[in-house]
Amino acid sequence: MICQFKRLIYPKAVTAGDASYMIALYRPCEKVMDAAGNVVSEIKAVGYCLPTADNLRYDMRGRWSRSAKHGIQFEVEGFDEVIVPSKEGVIAYLCSGQIKGIGPKTAEKIYAMFGQNTLTVLDHEPEQLLAVSGISKTKLKKICDSYLASRGARDVVAFLAPHGVTPNRAVKLYKQFGEHTMDIVRNHPYRLCEMVGVGFKTADRIAVSMGFDPLSPERVDEGLMFTLTDAELKGHLCMEKHSFLKQCLKLLDTEGLTEEMLAVRASRMLESGRLASYDRQVYRAVTARTEQSLAWAVYRMLTYEKAGSHVNIDTEISAEEKKQGIQLASEQRHAVTTALTSQLSVITGGPGTGKTLIQRFLLDIYRRKNRGAKIICCAPTGRAARRMEQATGFPATTIHKALGLLAGEDGDYCEPEMLDADLIVVDEVSMMDIYLANHLFRSVPHGSQLVLIGDADQLPSVGPGAVLSEIIACGAVPVVRLDRIFRQSYGSRIAANAKLIRHGNLSLEYGEDFQFYDSCDMSTSAQQIETLYLQETAKYGVDNVALLTPYRQKTETGVNALNERLREKLNPQDGKKPEVAYRKRIYRLGDKVMQIKNCEDISNGDIGYITSVTRDDTDSVLTVDFGDGRIAEYDGSDLEMLDLAYASTIHKSQGSEYKSVIINLQCAHAVMLVRPLVYTAITRAKERVLIVGERRALCIAIKRTDTEQRGTMLSARIKELISNVKGDHYNGNLAQ
């Protein structure tokens, strides 16, 4: 039936492409009879992703239903726009709000260039729109995605919306599977697990709603895969056989399903190559290949000849000491010597032990000894790289940029480039997960030296693996551990207390540079944090103060709540500052923000300030200045990449350093209270640490080592390659 949008009943307002459940009234444009045979003057329609542009007509598909509570209503199963083949009709469709990035002015320009061929261009040659002034590559992508959602992917978007799949994700599914998407969704829902962001639980909900057999091999196989994928999200590369099967059985929760049945399916997946095993551990095949690849790369570097003579290095170190007016301690001298004479080496230690000084000596001596040699300094995050550059005086970049790794639409990365360097120095190595480490090691040219620097006692990487700890544990890589604290200036209690925490010692020393503020409830803590934050930022400046807390959400002292609270103190709305609302967040001119996804020029974790808020034909555009001449613009869904940055999680602070750090620790933080967490938090500070919360929470964290050791066999694989002795591997049969 042909009809036109009249008004929304529920919800009260929606944005374009909203995937929520909707109830709306439509005006029929032709004679329409309801389920009772009555001619109607308006239609109450229900469904997901209903059209709300009042300047278009729609051909609605679906069925009438009747209930005692809601009466007669039309359940929408799909719809198409009725586009009048005229200038007015095409322009009305283009600027109806369903195609992001096209407003009235842009619609006029497009029609002026393509006329009645406009929709053909959108369907088959959308790149031609780049010829229209005002349409950039970024805007073209937005136009294409929303046009696809409003046309070919519409049925997919509507079908998946009740199952929690966002319109953006549904459009990506449509891009991947094309015209076969609906067939796959209805008949092979577990194939949706192939798509990044659509996990087993979503696919399972869809399958169950359509009556799939809960004991089907397809469901069991994807349950096994999801069990391992979920473990990777928690930092593990692999799972022990029995733990793996037990966890999957709990996930599938199906009557009649046993561990023995799961073992048979898992064995077949081993045979087909979807799973892999090593020494009674089970992996996703791609993860096992990555771990083995990294082990081979480490082994390969260990087989190279030594890089230089100790005698020459001793002379060079003495000359550098004289030049800098500093005398290295014996362990620091040993670290520089090891790095310069080894193809692969590790330098690890806590704050105040001289890691930065060692880097300066290492780089200066290497450059003097090897004139014309190429050096690359890098770190996992942009902030860590800039800190490395400031401390050493050598240019530094992120590992991703050094390798030419640019994230694609779904977070996948292209193949890394071979590094053009003779010496590669990597800082903050504890933040590297198995995948980034494998990319890095595979890109080191034959004969080049690699120096890994980091603190093995910090939190492990967000991604899976424990790369730094495992490389140290293999016992084959030259490792220098720095344990002696040399920092004697203001803030020395920080380094001393960090060492105590590392050893589980509760006898911390308090004073002007290390303070504790008792507060047993969240509300009092939030108020105390606000007072201290305003005090510290007034003294040191906003950029030199960090507010760190374990949780993002849930409490008054979570990152989200603190960000809103502090923004209203530091950057309040005075009625003149333009701002943009996106989802549940407001971005305001002058706000301090953080990039939370790697882009070509801006790295995950980079912090900047919103310098302008403008509006183009359809969207508000934010301009963010990240410093060092790096300026980026954000509009529409790009805002997903920004977060307020007055407060941060402790995990997100890794690789950063501040003059003053405020930390919140409450007993309610429960499972987050582990030694590496509090150690990482306090070692972000150079001059002052202010802890707000419960002393018992601090004691729990110090006494509690990481709750669960990460499942990884990297160290064992390296040892096996060195010894050339095969381990106790599976024969491919998990049913044994």
Locations of the language-model features?
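Loop/turn positions that initiate beta-strands
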Residues: 55-59, 590, 605
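N-terminal pre-P-loop "Q-motif" helix
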Residues: 325-341
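Conserved helicase motor core of P-loop NTPases
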Residues: 456-601, 611, 721, 729
